[in-house]
Regions:
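Pre-recognition alpha-helix immediately N-terminal to the DNA-recognition helix
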Residues: 21, 25, 41-44, 103
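Short capping segments at the starts of secondary-structure elements
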Residues: 49-53
Length: 147
């Protein structure tokens, strides 16, 4: 797509198309039938935090709880996570990684980093950092936007 074409697209449409393309690109690198890139992102988030509840995952990844719950159920079915009730609030479910998930993250993460590095190399480090800053600015604007 040329820059002129990009300027004629709305932000929502262009971001959704780009997101699908990037998701497919990362899926090629992962090359894993057991887990999607979205589920891998969840595993990495839980890995970084030790354990999280569904609300924390949804808030951090800016996803609705239904989508998070659906993916968590798939991850549990594949043996990647364990779910326990919170000691202080029985309504909350605490999500933790299993040894199988730690192994999966260790296996996929280098491929994930390679995929990201190739994108950064393609557009250049300076443009890539600027792109990430713009995305963060848009996210912040939308998160706090009130009509």
């Amino acid at each position: 797509m040329s820059n002129t074409d990009a300027k004629n697209k709305c932000a929502c449409s262009l971001l959704r198309m780009t997101t699908r393309a990037v998701t497919n690109y990362f899926a090629m690198f992962i090359d894993d039938k057991e887990i999607t890139s979205q589920q891998f992102t969840m595993l990495v988030l839980i890995h970084k935090n030790g354990s999280l509840c569904i609300n924390d995952i949804a808030d951090t990844l800016i996803m609705d709880q239904t989508t998070v719950t659906r993916n968590i159920n798939v991850l549990q079915k594949h043996g990647f996570i364990s779910i326990k009730k919170d000691k202080h609030d029985a309504r909350k479910r605490i999500i933790s990684l299993t040894p199988k998930a730690f192994s999966k993250v260790e296996n996929i993460l280098p491929k994930w980093i390679d995929a990201q590095a190739q994108i950064e190399n393609h557009v250049g480090s300076e443009r890539y950092r600027a792109f990430l800053e713009v995305l963060a600015d848009i996210e912040t604007f939308i998160k706090y936007f009130k009509l």
